[in-house]
Amino acid sequence: MTDLSDIRREYTKGGLRRADLPQNPMQLFELWMTQARDAELSDPTAMCVATVDEHGQPYQRIVLLKRFDDSGFVFFTNLGSRKAQQIAANNKVSLHFPWHPIERQVSILGEAQPLSTAEVLKYFMTRPKDSQIAAWVSQQSSKLSARQVLEGKFFEMKAKFAKGDVPLPSFWGGYLVKPSSIEFWQGGEHRLHDRFLYTRQADEWVIDRLAP
């Protein structure tokens, strides 16, 4: 077994105090996202999306956040993917933003709701053309005999859609994750980290400090 117990560091970038918290967690998330971008973090919009299959087995993968507002968090994916199939059976999901360089994490629990075709199309048309074509190529989570199969199909579809717009695939969509709770974690000295949990109750958010 490889021993990693000596890998550690102190957290020194500041604390989080209840007096500084807005009543709406989305305001704090927007501030932290802005600060993550200003700090030039690599992929600040990258989040871990966790789902569960019919046997209770959890799965995780990194997906890019594409939009957020008071209603929730939006991401897009292939509707034939493992994550989409699991969401169809159980739409309770967890999102996690690991902003290690600025000693912060955000963890979100909620339910994923499918976006309308109009909402999906609006985003799809903003993607680079090669990314639009790639959406047609990949049968996400299916087995491939070789990478050449994927590349061959990409160039085939690229020739097919050489002229004009790339249409939206019927098997490509998106989700709005409506949060039921949002936890903000700020690293603290001596491992005395600051954790605040916002829990949705009716039309209000209840705030609790959690032990580190």
UniProtKB/Swiss-Prot annotation:
For this UniProt record, the keywords arranged alphabetically read as follows: Flavoprotein, FMN, Oxidoreductase, Pyridoxine biosynthesis
GO-annotated molecular function: FMN binding; pyridoxamine phosphate oxidase activity
| Enzyme class label | oxidoreductase
Annotated residues for binding of substrate: R8, R9, E10, Y11, K66, Y123, R127, S131, R191, L192, H193
One Gene Ontology term from the biological process aspect of the record: pyridoxine biosynthetic process
Q: Which Pfam family is one of those matched by this entry?
A: PNP_phzG_C
Q: Which PROSITE patterns match?
A: PYRIDOX_OXIDASE
Names of the cofactor(s): FMN
Catalytic activity annotation: pyridoxamine 5'-phosphate + O2 + H2O = pyridoxal 5'-phosphate + H2O2 + NH4(+); pyridoxine 5'-phosphate + O2 = pyridoxal 5'-phosphate + H2O2
Enzyme Commission code: 1.4.3.5
| SUPFAM superfamilies the record matches | FMN-binding split barrel
Which amino acids does the record list as binding FMN? Answer: 61-66, 76-77, 82-83, 105, 140-141, 185, 195
Cross-referenced InterPro entries, in alphabetical order? Pyridox_Oxase, Pyridox_Oxase_CS, Pyridox_Oxase_N, Pyridoxamine_oxidase_dimer_C, Split_barrel_FMN-bd
Q: How is the cofactor bound?
A: Binds 1 FMN per subunit.
Asked if Metal-binding is a keyword of the record, the answer is no
Keyword Oxidoreductase among UniProt keywords:
yes
Q: In which pathway does it act?
A: Cofactor metabolism; pyridoxal 5'-phosphate salvage; pyridoxal 5'-phosphate from pyridoxamine 5'-phosphate: step 1/1; Cofactor metabolism; pyridoxal 5'-phosphate salvage; pyridoxal 5'-phosphate from pyridoxine 5'-phosphate: step 1/1
What's this protein's function? Catalyzes the oxidation of either pyridoxine 5'-phosphate (PNP) or pyridoxamine 5'-phosphate (PMP) into pyridoxal 5'-phosphate (PLP).
Give the similarity note: Belongs to the pyridoxamine 5'-phosphate oxidase family.
Classification via HAMAP family: PdxH
Fetch the NCBIfam families from UniProt: pdxH, PRK05679.1
* Record note on quaternary structure: Homodimer.
Q: What's this protein's name?
A: Pyridoxine/pyridoxamine 5'-phosphate oxidase
Q: Which source organism does the UniProt entry give?
A: Shewanella sp. (strain MR-4)
Which gene is the coding source of this polypeptide chain? pdxH
